Amino acid sequence: MIKELRQKFNADFTKEKYDAYMAKLEALHPGALDFRNAETPVFVPKDFTAKMLGACEDIIDVIVDPKFISLTDRGIPANVKVPNENSHAEFIVFDFGICENEKGELEPQLIEMQGFPTLYAFQAFHSELTAEYANLPANFSAYLNGYTKETYTQLLKEIIVGDLNPENVILLEIFPEQQKTRIDFYCTEQLLGIKTVCLTKLIAEGNKLFYDNNGTKTEVKRIYNRLIFDDLQKQES
């Protein structure tokens, strides 16, 4: 979207550079990168970034409104409701399409929004390797609102681990080794020090949960849930 950067990237692109880039991504956790990775980043100008952020803020204003839960309560099937939920999601992901309006200007159009975590740990490593591969100018970053890899990682840790010992926090999934996003599970452990545990491996004792932490039965005090109900229901059927 930034013509000068696009032209420079295209002129400098070689298959050898791309293969070397992919090799570095693969080397993060060999055999775990199970989805397509684009040959090029998208070079987003400041004005378009501002439009996307503005759209996100407008939507979030609705979500954090105290009336939102009552307005959407009937939209969630009773069998997937979780007791003691927070007032709003800690993680929200927006997918935008790049469209042209009647004036010929580019503007973002919301395709999808999900209140669920995605590749949050992997993207920290991905952004770093992509910036190196694309030879991005120093003032360009995948992080928004002044965040850096360090401050982003710290925020992620505050949300997921909080003030707990990382060994008492787990990433929960169903058959994690089979998931296409499993590289993010391994990157999460690398960044935050928390283990990935399969739902079938949890140990329930009274109202407490435990998991086998390298031979030591360890209490689970917080769960970073990556389990999608649809996947669980497929397993049950």
Question: Which stretches of residues belong to each language-model region?
Answer:
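Preference for protein termini
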Residues: 1-237
